[in-house]
Design a protein with these regions (language model features):
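Membrane-embedded alpha-helical bundles of multi-pass integral membrane proteins
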Residues: 2-168, 183
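Ferredoxin-reductase
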Residues: 178-242
């Protein structure tokens, strides 16, 4: 299996989370898994080359990204119904509820994505980061000293929380600035049908890919939308520079 490294990374994260919560506070294992799953969702969305190599293709990274996002919602809903309001401050509970409402709303928007403009959908999708921050406030306000004193649990939760925050910050504020190392020029543009275009691009340096994978392209020419869009890749003339 070519994506074994990526799958081992996901499985190891969940196993470590389960073992840590089971040995310290087993009653909070569900929200603990939700936090790890959310952090993994942000990490997978960074499109880092390392992750792409681990999963053997960006399309496989996004398949797992969708899985962890869906799993996060299921865990959060289950947590909300099974433990909501049992303990903790009113403000902490409000942060948690607000985070869940935002997550669910964005999931609904995702299903309506094909009916709204991509740029609008992309900005709405970024609200997930705000919900994640609300969720972290909820967790740390609820757990108190358990997560503020150094131990295995606080190290695990803090590590994944920090990775999730850094990943989200990178996606929203840094991705379009420091990414896109491959420059190219469009050499041919062909309309295949009413909603499909074939674009041939000559790159400034070789780019290894396989037919059927996809990549994000950004158009720098003035007058065009600057947001990166995903495009399917075809092995045109079996060249890696076009």
């Amino acid at each position: 299996m070519k994506s074994i490294k990526g799958l081992l990374f996901i499985i190891a994260s969940f196993v470590l989370t389960i073992l840590t919560w089971m040995s310290t506070s087993p009653q909070f294992m569900i929200p603990g898994l939700a936090l790890t799953s959310l952090s993994l969702t942000f990490i997978l969305a960074t499109r880092l080359p390392l992750l792409e190599s681990w999963f053997h293709g960006l399309e496989k990274v996004y398949t797992v990204h969708k899985f962890t996002a869906f799993l996060s919602i299921i865990l959060l809903i289950f947590h909300n119904f099974s433990m909501g309001g049992l303990w903790g401050s009113r403000l902490a509970a409000q942060f948690g509820n607000l985070a869940i409402y935002i997550f669910i709303s964005i999931i609904l928007v995702a299903y309506l994505g094909k009916y709204i403009q991509y740029e609008a959908w992309r900005w709405i999708h970024r609200l997930v980061y705000l919900a994640y921050i609300f969720g972290l406030f909820h967790v740390y306000m609820m757990m108190g000293n358990r997560l503020l004193t150094f131990n295995l649990l606080s190290f695990l939760v803090g590590s994944y929380a920090l990775l999730g925050l850094l990943a989200g910050f990178y996606i929203i504020f840094l991705y379009q600035i420091i990414t896109f190392p491959y420059l190219g020029k469009i050499t041919n543009l062909k309309r295949l049908n009413h909603d499909t275009r074939e674009i041939q691009i000559h790159l400034s340096k070789p780019f290894n890919y396989q037919s059927g994978q996809f990549a994000f392209l950004k158009i720098f020419q003035e007058g065009f939308e600057s947001a990166p869009h995903p495009f399917s890749l075809q092995n045109w003339r079996k060249r890696s520079d076009s």
